[in-house]
Amino acid sequence: MILIDGKSLSKDLKERLATQVQEYKHHTAITPKLVAIIVGNDPASKTYVASKEKACAQVGIDSQVITLPEHTTESELLELIDQLNNDSSVHAILVQLPLPAHINKNNVIYSIKPEKDVDGFHPTNVGRLQLRDKKCLESCTPKGIMTMLREYGIKTEGAYVVVVGASNVVGKPVSQLLLNAKATVTTCHRFTTDLKSHTTKADILIVAVGKPNFITADMVKEGAVVIDVGINHVDGKIVGDVDFAAVKDKVAAITPVPGGVGPMTITELLYNTFQCAQELNR
């Protein structure tokens, strides 16, 4: 069994990116810059953004965090985004979710200039993904999954892939990326009947449902590759959507939780920020 070590791979990729960023800065005198916006005092949001700030510093990308009070109105937030859209020194914009209930998430996402939409959530980037447009900013977690498969030499062309979970953030975009990579893809969701009949046929199984230990050994094909996107808190520990202990001896390769997909998400955010800077300054 191969352990797909996202933490180690992420470290290697950041070192590669740091070299690229340094060369880019030397040749253009432009420093890529990411601005992250937090609305309110959600502790998890602050932790996530702090880790993104730290990662930016490691590769030579500038970052700025703007923290707004909980009572910030939607129009005030949209006005700030408009200012950042028109600031040529800012290349990438991230609004940390969740937002307070009185702010419409879609209005906020749609207001970010597609070329600065580092999360890849804007409808323009979603459409570009479908069309295989090279200017597409791909959503960070799905992009990280594809990078893991590629870096570990796991072939997608001709593979039968089952994605469990159909969210806009992971399930749908990773399904599209896999289609683009010439895989045959089945996307399962909560209305899928007889889920096991699908998962046991998968050469590659990707799980993103937010249910601890949801995938058990009897749901996985012998010799499959399993990518566990889940992050669940159980009895003070972080566990995935896959019962790792039961599944690991049955599969060819598997991601751990923590230390699998999670670190790759932040690394791809850095790569997207660099892509934003390059595209905006062509």
Curated annotation (Swiss-Prot):
Function as written in the Swiss-Prot or TrEMBL entry: Catalyzes the oxidation of 5,10-methylenetetrahydrofolate to 5,10-methenyltetrahydrofolate and then the hydrolysis of 5,10-methenyltetrahydrofolate to 10-formyltetrahydrofolate.
NCBIfam families, sorted: PRK10792.1, PRK14180.1, PRK14186.1
Assembly description: Homodimer.
Transmembrane segments: none
Pfam families: THF_DHG_CYH, THF_DHG_CYH_C
Keyword Amino-acid biosynthesis among record annotations: yes
UniProt record similarity statement: Belongs to the tetrahydrofolate dehydrogenase/cyclohydrolase family.
Name of the protein described by the UniProt record: Bifunctional protein FolD
Lineage per the UniProt record: Bacteria, Pseudomonadati, Pseudomonadota, Gammaproteobacteria, Thiotrichales
Pathway: One-carbon metabolism; tetrahydrofolate interconversion
Binding residue positions for NADP(+): 165-167, 231
Keywords linked to the UniProt accession: Amino-acid biosynthesis, Histidine biosynthesis, Hydrolase, Methionine biosynthesis, Multifunctional enzyme, NADP, One-carbon metabolism, Oxidoreductase, Purine biosynthesis
Domain of life according to the entry: Bacteria
Its EC number(s): 1.5.1.5, 3.5.4.9
Catalytic activity: (6R)-5,10-methylene-5,6,7,8-tetrahydrofolate + NADP(+) = (6R)-5,10-methenyltetrahydrofolate + NADPH; (6R)-5,10-methenyltetrahydrofolate + H2O = (6R)-10-formyltetrahydrofolate + H(+)
Gene Ontology MF: a single term: methylenetetrahydrofolate dehydrogenase (NADP+) activity
GO biological process entries: L-histidine biosynthetic process; methionine biosynthetic process; purine nucleotide biosynthetic process; tetrahydrofolate interconversion
GO cellular component, one term: cytosol
